[in-house]
Amino acid sequence: MFDPLSSSPDFLTFRTSLNLNQQNNSISSDDIVSKGFIGGNDLSTMMNTMSIDANNNNNNNNNNIDSNNINNINLNGISLCDNKNSIDNNYEETIIRTSNNNNNNSSSSSKANDIVITTTTTTTTTISMTSPTLSSDNRITLYTPPPSPPNGINYFNSSLSLSSNNSSQGVFISQHRMIAMHKISIGQKKKVYTYIYIFNLLFI
């Protein structure tokens, strides 16, 4: 039975980076990888974001994705790296694959997907996706980071926004939180920290 804890001073947090290849609208197994670093016990300092590198020839910008050829991208293929025999505290690589799909209840002008990534320091990684209803106002402000973020975390520019009348596209976090759990492993109680990231991808 899992025993949720509200916080812990010795958790391992993750930085997730997403590279979007605009040539074929796909994400390979090397494109989204969790990378660990040691955090503190202040919940506000361990919040993470997903940073985007627009992999379009010479264009590299962590805040924007060029609008060329990705308006109808659909995250409909999900694959997980899973090693059930692993008993160490190594984080797992999470793989998300995408494909071009025009018929996923999306309007012709915009589309949003919520991606929930749950990963632990042992072997459990879960990703689920829902397609929420967009509001009539497609303009949205990217995630504003908490004060004093830990070193090595790239946050989005809080002043950057998405609008149907500009070419900016991006990813922001709609919600994220951390829970710590105990897990029984090989006859001993083992502390496993689970981090839940909820991302919202908005393509305008």
Swiss-Prot record:
Its recorded name reads Uncharacterized protein DDB_G0286107
